């Protein structure tokens, strides 16, 4: 698969802020949603960032496929939680965009898909267009993503009471 420099930059910036970072895409949207659901049910907040890319002049280039990926994860999360309560307008629009997409055709005809196909990466685009074919939930640990299933369970969250 092809790397996402902008996605990597965002992932590391979020991790540096103390957030737990999970890699999600069309291929693992359901698995990520199932992993997130109990955390959200326990009160955790979720931020889904459709990273986009950068133009050659370093300005942001939105990527519709990242919006679809965000919508796929959020749609699956809503289904897991059986509620869209608290979803932002942006989250609801991502879910709507996901509901409107026709894969793989739309991805192959999107600007990024055409660009990658023209560069000889059509097989990568076709793989990226697959939905819910992976159960891997990649969690950023240090400088690499690791499968959440292979990580030790988190310890209890302790806080100091009094002095």
Task: Give the residues covered by each predicted segment.
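Internal, conserved structured core segments that host functional sites
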Residues: 2-60
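Long, charged alpha-helical interface segments
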Residues: 5, 14-20, 61-163
